[in-house]
Amino acid sequence: MSKQNLIEIEGLVTESLPNAMFRVCLDNGCEVLTHISGKIRKNYIRILPGDRVKVELSPYDLTKGRITYRLRSKNTNT
């Protein structure tokens, strides 16, 4: 699948699951099951519940996605 067909949306990580899977509540209210992209996995970027992330969804299955970016928190103390 080409990158132009993907839907990119932001959301909030609500739950961390085994095997680097996460449950993410999207900004539109939907909840999807996501996994980490290869670049995030390779660079050891930690994703925890409460983090804001960018998620890529396939138009064929809107219940599963891939986390492509962890957004910086607005709180500068962490």
UniProtKB/Swiss-Prot annotation:
Q: Which SMART domains match?
A: S1 (SM00316)
Task: Read off the PROSITE patterns from this record.
Answer: S1_IF1_TYPE
Membrane-crossing ranges are: none
GO molecular function annotation:
ribosome binding; rRNA binding; translation initiation factor activity
Gene3D superfamilies linked to this entry: Nucleic acid-binding proteins
Which InterPro entries does the UniProt entry name for this protein?
NA-bd_OB-fold, RNA-binding_domain_S1_IF1, S1_domain, TIF_IF1
Q: What does the protein in this record do?
A: One of the essential components for the initiation of protein synthesis. Stabilizes the binding of IF-2 and IF-3 on the 30S subunit to which N-formylmethionyl-tRNA(fMet) subsequently binds. Helps modulate mRNA selection, yielding the 30S pre-initiation complex (PIC). Upon addition of the 50S ribosomal subunit IF-1, IF-2 and IF-3 are released leaving the mature 70S translation initiation complex.
Q: What is this protein called?
A: Translation initiation factor IF-1, chloroplastic
